[in-house]
UniProtKB/Swiss-Prot annotation:
Region (Indole-3-glycerol phosphate synthase) location: 238-503
Pathway terms, separated by semicolons: Amino-acid biosynthesis; L-tryptophan biosynthesis; L-tryptophan from chorismate: step 1/5; Amino-acid biosynthesis; L-tryptophan biosynthesis; L-tryptophan from chorismate: step 3/5; Amino-acid biosynthesis; L-tryptophan biosynthesis; L-tryptophan from chorismate: step 4/5
Name of this chain's protein: Multifunctional tryptophan biosynthesis protein
Species: Phanerodontia chrysosporium (White-rot fungus)
Matching PANTHER family: INDOLE-3-GLYCEROL-PHOSPHATE SYNTHASE (PTHR22854:SF2), TRYPTOPHAN BIOSYNTHESIS PROTEIN (PTHR22854)
GO biological process: L-tryptophan biosynthetic process
NCBIfam families: PRK00278.2-4, trpG_papA
Location of the Glutamine amidotransferase type-1 domain: 12-207
Classification via CDD domains: GATase1_Anthranilate_Synthase, IGPS, PRAI
Length: 788
């Protein structure tokens, strides 16, 4: 039989998959180290086709069963390639190597699934330069026996206490194997071990002297005897190990200058923590039930790497715009690969949404210090895990969290823990379907405990293992008010689509791209009541009044008051209309637009009065602003933060040069509410725009609109070492006011090309002598812009 085409080429690393999901964890680890790995199932080709393979290295993966009955071609491949290329066996792969060379595989004496053991090793071969006592994650019930091991094989590693074989090596050939899983997130120095294997060359240790396998100066590796059961040390559970490490982390943070407990108290007293919202109220306010708590989660002890390229801020914004009520951020660094920075950036990313989700610090909270950290970095709530705390300590941390205005999420896993949470008076209780001591998942846990909170004023949350709408619907029927979803969301190829499917949300309407919209129009440089009223009757949505003294269209405060009085009087004669549209969670600039382009802009309040200023003292802005103007336009080089000091919305002008400069920070949220693009006159010393009739490059403006206000992640998986822009999409076009060049003759084309939110005109509708507005041109401009 000939090989399939994809196996007929030279192969860097061939991995034989023994039908085990861990194969792909191992595959990912190797790929992240730069390896080119080809994976085939152990029944993909017949034994007779093995000699046709052209490979540089062979790996035999983990797998269930016994090597003699369940390993397919693995043993034959080891026999053929031993002495020709480097070979690595993992878990069942080790058992296959031992079996091939004449050893016996038998019951290990204990089933080790997800258990962690420290190991000693011989510091040679793939263990070269690795520290002693490294932690190893074990998933096996079989192992090699020392007494039956053939002379060709040497023991290279054993567990520290039980002396179970964790590594073997052929004495002549470059054949290494480990019983544990180096690719596991809990296994220490796993990448280094795999990296060493990738550096091996040829089929013998003589060809690899740098690995010191044949070095006579090194001492022999002493296996030792298995100690009596009574002296065997207890192996800590994963939960115990995590909590012990978190205590070390907290102690280190407390001792670091700038982050001492006193420092955090001072910062909190200075009100430097972001404003908070009520966690329970946010869950209750969810429009779609159950409320979704969407989690940012890069890795876990049970699953290893999940989405190592995930960007916490972008993921949080994607969740929020898709309908999440809570953003849960893992901040544990060692096993979950999270950080406080992740949480702070996630909070910043959603800070300017009109209905921002609550931020949950998901961590192993064991100290009040961590609660201070959480509040300072923007959390609205923290997780308290009953399984990690004594009842007294739980009460203390719960009360302390409440003292900072944060109602905690209290996590339970069984009836006893639920009783403790209810006694505590917790308002939000989460049931973790995953037992944190062994990380096994039982989806029935929430269902069994739901009855205990029925008829109580408690929001019950399901916290783990949720993968589809069926799981969600089952919990809703049992009274669950919120679901936390992490891994499934992080692995989803389309995050927003998965959330819609999970919560049975219909597809929302387009946010702007490809959607027909009519732009607003503004007539700038109004100088008289007559011009203002004529522009208003023509359908202008905004009128610009120039307060820049050097402008030829400058109006005094007295004249501005007269114009404002005329417009305000006109407004009062119009009926008050409401839009009736439910406000959605939308990005900052999109949310500033009138709902359905109606209400204020199209009806009773139209047109709005805009005061235009340029590099003038704040006192000048504020004098006319409060009683007269609806908006302020900053047309100079004013600091962006100045927008926070005005009592009315602010339009910030971006001065665009012919080469595209001037667009930096166009989409920065939270300061000005609207952005206007105007063209800089070529050769201008001030680099400021306005009043010259210079046309903005419409292609540049179009690209700015299409680039979008925000980019939401399609998937947390990304496509490289970081989540690239190609892995995200702009669902919300950037709303801009297009100035600089539009006039009655070209505004329709400008609208078609750029798709602006509004168009602005000044000199393009003036009389020939520039003394005022040509009212016919004003009417023609509005008509052409709105395609009336």
């Amino acid at each position: 039989m000939s090989l399939p085409p994809h196996l007929c080429v030279p192969i860097d690393i061939l991995m034989i998959d023994n039908f085990d999901s861990f194969t792909w964890n191992l595959y990912q680890s190797l790929c992240l180290l730069g390896a080119d790995v080809t994976v085939i199932r152990n029944d993909a080709i017949p034994r007779s086709a093995i000699p046709q393979l052209r490979i540089k290295r062979l790996i035999v993966s983990p797998g269930p069963g016994h090597p003699q009955t369940d390993s397919g071609i693995s043993r034959e491949a080891i026999k053929y390639f031993a002495g020709k290329v480097p070979i690595m066996g993992v878990c069942m792969g080790l058992e296959c190597v031992v079996d091939v060379f004449g050893g016996q595989i038998a019951y290990a004496g204990e089933i080790m699934h997800g258990k962690v053991s420290g190991i000693r090793h011989d510091a040679r071969g793939c263990f070269k330069d690795l520290p002693q006592g490294i932690q190893s994650t074990r998933y096996h019930s079989l192992s090699a026996g020392v007494k039956t091991l053939p002379d060709e094989l040497a023991v290279t590693a054993v567990t520290e206490h039980e002396r179970v074989i964790m590594g073997i090596r052929h004495r002549k050939y470059t054949v290494e194997a480990v019983q544990y899983h180096p690719e596991s997130i809990l296994s220490e120095s796993g990448d280094d071990l795999l990296r060493h294997f990738m550096k091996l060359k040829g089929g013998t240790w003589e060809e690899n002297p740098e690995f010191r396998v044949l070095d006579p100066s090194l001492p022999a590796f002493e296996i030792g005897s298995q100690p009596a059961a009574s002296t065997s040390a207890k192996i800590p559970t994963i939960l115990e190990k995590i909590c012990a490490q978190r205590q070390k982390d907290v102690d280190q943070a407390k001792a670091t200058p700038g982050t001492t407990p006193e420092d955090l108290k001072t910062l909190l007293s200075m009100k430097l923590s972001p404003p908070q919202i009520s966690f329970p109220d946010r869950l209750k306010a969810a429009e779609v039930k159950p409320a979704l708590m969407a989690e940012v989660k890069r890795a876990s002890p049970s699953k290893g790497p999940i989405a190592m390229n995930g960007n916490a801020a972008q993921q949080a914004l994607t969740y929020a715009l898709a309908g999440a009520s809570v953003i849960s951020v893992l901040t544990e660094p060692t096993w979950f690969k999270g950080s406080l920075l992740d949480m702070r950036l996630a909070r910043q990313a959603i800070d300017n949404l009109p209905h921002r989700p609550a931020i949950l610090r998901k961590d192993f909270i064991i100290d009040e210090y961590q609660i201070d950290e959480a509040r300072l970095h923007g959390a609205d709530t923290v997780l308290l895990i009953v399984a990690t705390l004594t009842e007294k300590r739980l009460e203390e941390l719960y009360a302390y969290s409440q003292s900072l205005g944060m109602e905690p999420l209290v996590e339970v896993n069984n009836a006893k823990e639920m009783e403790i949470a209810l006694k505590l008076g917790a308002k939000v209780i989460g049931v973790n379907n995953r037992n944190l001591h062994d990380f096994n998942v039982d989806m029935g846990t929430t269902s069994r405990l739901a009855e205990m909170v029925r008829e109580r004023d408690v929001i019950l949350c399901a916290l783990s293992g949720i993968k589809d709408a069926q799981d969600v619907n089952t919990y809703v029927e049992q009274g669950v008010g919120a679901v936390l979803v992490g891994e499934s969301l992080m692995r989803a190829p389309d995050t927003r689509a998965f959330i819609r499917q999970l919560l049975s949300i219909p597809e929302s309407e387009a946010k702007g791209k490809g959607k027909e919209t009519t732009p607003l129009s503004r007539s700038c440089g109004i100088r008289t009541e007559e011009e203002a009223l004529a522009a208003a009757e023509a359908g202008a949505d905004m009128l610009g009044l120039m307060f820049v003294p050097k402008s030829k269209r400058y109006v005094s405060l007295e004249k501005a008051q007269q114009i404002a009085a005329a417009i305000h009087s006109r407004r009062l004669s119009k009926p008050v209309l409401t839009s009736g549209k439910t406000l959605e969670n939308e990005p900052w600039f999109t949310a500033q637009q009138p709902p359905s382009r109606s209400f204020v802009w199209r009806f009773a309040a139209r047109p709005l009065l805009v005061g235009v200023f340029q590099n003038q003292p704040l006192s000048v802005y504020l004098t006319p602003c409060v009683p007269q103007l609806d908006l302020v336009q900053l047309h100079g080089s004013e600091p962006a933060e100045l927008a926070k000091h005005y009592p009315v919305p602010v339009i910030r002008v971006f001065h665009v040069s012919a080469d595209g400069r001037g667009l930096a920070d166009l989409a920065r949220p939270g300061l000005h509410q609207f952005a206007l693009l105007d063209a800089v006159l070529p050769g201008s010393a001030s680099a400021l725009s306005g009043g010259t009739g210079t046309t903005v490059d419409w292609a540049l403006a179009r690209d700015a609109v299409r680039s979008g206000e925000v980019r939401v992640a399609r998937s947390a998986q990304g496509d490289g070492p970081v989540l690239s822009l190609n892995s995200s999409e702009a669902l919300y076009p950037m709303p801009v006011i297009l100035a600089g060049g539009p006039q009655p003759e070209n505004v329709s084309e400008a609208v078609d090309t750029v798709a602006p939110w509004a168009v602005d005109v000044s000199g393009g509708v003036e009389l020939e002598d520039g003394s005022g507005k040509d009212l016919e041109k004003v009417r023609a401009f509005v008509k052409a812009a709105k395609k009336l």
